[in-house]
Amino acid sequence: MTTTLTLSRRAALHWAVASAGAVMAPALMAQTKAALTTGMEIWKDASCGCCGDWIKHMEANGFKVDAIHDTGNNAARARLGLAAKYGSCHTALIGSYVVEGHVPAADVKRLLREKPQALGIAVPGMPIGSPGMDGPVYGGRRDKYDTLLVKRDGTSHVFQSHS
């Protein structure tokens, strides 16, 4: 007795997508875990409370802090090649990327997952409602802001918008 199995195109496509997901999911999860265990080095002012709150946000989202330098961040930002126009109150180095300012952990995770050809990402200034600038003192206020992807040539474009 012979049994014939016939797959429609739709069923074959669903099977292919499900198979690809099953094969790729462990690799993506391992890649994300590896990114999160990459140490983070931070430069900030010793008395800056919002920087400390941003660090807590990053740690709560799985990032490991290797070193905190309470010496300010202007010299570190310049040494790492990030223009002052992208500046904020703290600068971090995560893997090979500069992370400037109150960047959400989700944006950093995306940066590490996608690995774009870039110097890093930045949230210039100190937008209210961004991580570290979102405490009770701000009364729930949330300003719109953008996380910028900064290229090595100094140009940038919007990496992620937040409202």
What are these model-predicted stretches?
Residues 36-53:
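Local sequence-structure signature of Cys/Sec-based thiol-disulfide redox active-site neighborhoods
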Residues 79, 85-163:
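Thiol/selenol-based redox catalytic cores and closely related redox-interacting motifs
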Residues 30-34:
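Boundary at the C-terminal end of the N-terminal hydrophobic targeting segment
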Residues 56-67:
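Iron-sulfur (Fe-S) cluster-binding segments and ferredoxin-like electron-carrier domains
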Residues 2-20:
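N-terminal secretory signal peptides and thylakoid transit peptides that target proteins
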Residues 47, 54, 69-72, 104-108:
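Stable alpha-helical elements in mature extracytoplasmic
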Residues 65-76, 86, 94:
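Thiol-based oxidoreductase modules, predominantly thioredoxin-like and allied folds used
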